[in-house]
Curated annotation (Swiss-Prot):
EC number: 4.2.1.18
Pfam families referenced in this protein's UniProt entry, alphabetically: ECH_1 (PF00378)
GO molecular function: enoyl-CoA hydratase activity; methylglutaconyl-CoA hydratase activity; mRNA 3'-UTR binding
Protein name: Methylglutaconyl-CoA hydratase, mitochondrial
Gene Ontology biological process: fatty acid beta-oxidation; L-leucine catabolic process
Organism the protein comes from: Dictyostelium discoideum
């Protein structure tokens, strides 16, 4: 088991040398910290790679306004494609997920589309949601959900897969699936109790309660609450605090925490040891020591 844990940790850093040339680049007019903007593409899910003072941040934006960003096949196909690009993009140090649609982050699954599916097709679609959110969760760089408006059902399950959740005072979150005689099927029954505890998770899922941002903050469902329209601003602020840090160290820290939470503490210590071993031979570690000695800010390159 120990050899297996160490091998998994070692393999996880090999992607650093892989590059991607398919990521969309943003323009200065396309991002004014969460303000709605126009774009030439008609994509329902848009990936941007920010530049200038926000370099290192990539943003996934949902733009399916006519159905309140409901999760349909086309949107999810685009979402998965963007996640695949980000997974092999060493220049991206933080990912922010947000909505471009006023008043809604994500209203959950597209139930009208779901009604046209056979039982097999419906099961396949739920499986694709579950696997997509796991892909989001296992991105090696930190992820931040900037929540404005409604984020229920699959919308809540999506933000649960992020490392940080920032909710504006316009936000509404919850898992109302039992009211439709189903259960959360894209990770909600597993991630929610791990985040807020079993009793509270059962209460929210059994009752289908919808929470405002204040209550979500109180129970630890989100880490930050902002004024309406400012969730993306806060997400950018958090991202800019992370970006100057050693990118390999950030990835290894995330890996050690995430993997360690799913095993006993002794095994978690082995994961931490193996993760720490990955940062020792890096150029960034030497740069950090040199910068400290020279009393200057370090410049980390992810090497």
């Amino acid at each position: 088991m120990i050899k297996h844990l160490i091998k998994n940790v070692s393999n996880s850093v090999k992607y650093n040398n892989v590059t991607s040339n398919n990521i969309l680049f943003s323009t200065s007019s396309s991002l004014k910290f969460g303000r709605k903007f126009t774009t030439e593409t008609q994509q329902e899910c848009i990936l941007e790679r920010l530049e200038g003072e926000n370099k290192g941040i990539s943003v996934i934006s949902f733009n399916r306004g006519h159905v309140k960003n409901a999760l349909g096949k086309n949107l999810m196909n685009q979402f998965r494609s963007h996640l695949n690009e980000l997974r092999f993009c060493p220049d991206t140090r933080v990912v922010i997920v947000r909505s471009l649609v006023d008043g809604v982050f994500c209203s959950g699954a597209d139930l009208k589309e779901r009604a046209l599916m056979s039982q097999v097709e419906a099961s396949q679609f739920v499986h694709s949601l579950r696997s997509s959110f796991t892909e989001l969760e296992t991105l090696q760089m930190p992820t931040i959900a900037a929540i404005e408006g409604v984020a229920v059902g699959g919308g809540t399950e999506m933000v649960l897969a992020c490392d940080f959740r920032v909710a504006s005072k316009s936000s509404k979150m919850g898992l109302p699936e039992t009211g439709l005689a189903i259960i959360p099927g894209a990770g909600g029954t597993q991630r929610l109790p791990r985040l807020i505890g079993i009793p509270r998770a059962k209460e929210l899922i059994f009752t289908g309660a919808i929470l405002d941002s204040k209550r979500a903050l109180e129970i630890g469902l989100v880490q930050y609450e902002t004024e309406k329209g400012e969730a993306f601003d806060k997400a950018i602020e958090i991202a800019k605090q992370i970006i100057p840090k050693g990118p390999i160290a950030i990835r290894m820290a995330k890996q050690a925490i995430d993997r360690g939470m799913n095993v006993d503490q002794a095994s978690g210590m082995i994961i931490e040891q193996a993760s720490y071993a990955q940062v020792i031979p890096t150029k960034d570690r030497i740069e950090g020591l040199t910068a400290f000695k020279e009393k200057r800010k370090p410049i980390y390159k992810g090497e």
